[in-house]
Amino acid sequence: MLLCVVCLGVGGCSSLPRQDGSSRNGGSSGGTGGNVGVLSGVSQGDASDAAIYAVGLVGTPYRYGANTPASGFDCSGLIGHVYKTRTGLNLPRSVAALQQWGQSVQGQELRAGDLVFFGRGAVASHAGVYVGQGRFVHAPSSGGTVRLDLLSAKYWAAQRLQYRRP
């Protein structure tokens, strides 16, 4: 039972099929029907820097529960490491908690550094960092590596749930 609770708490990412092809956080803001979560105050420059840094981590091994270049990354560990390293923010460690963080944005409003969420239900099971030009960086599955993928790829387009801006 304790093991189940620990696994749910870490909640990195679901295993996805292979494909070829803080402390600085502000308070909660209300009044927009749940579209605004914890606002961080990350500047666009810092968010872009985080996206560039994320691209540099492509090829790092996937490892469930890991969050450093030396140990590898799961999806939430990758996002947390990128934002901690480039902005000093301590982000939530689970995809479900990240899904409540920042401000909801529409797909046509995406900017480098925004977070993208995927899943088949209301709660996301996977997330990545948008880097521009329709692409995102993520740590997708056991046995894989951090990679750059297109949001428009059939697999990802079918699962897109939400976009959030730090």
PLM regions: where:
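Structural motif
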Residues: G113-D114, G134
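Stable alpha-helical elements in mature extracytoplasmic
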Residues: D46-A50, A54, D74-C75, I79
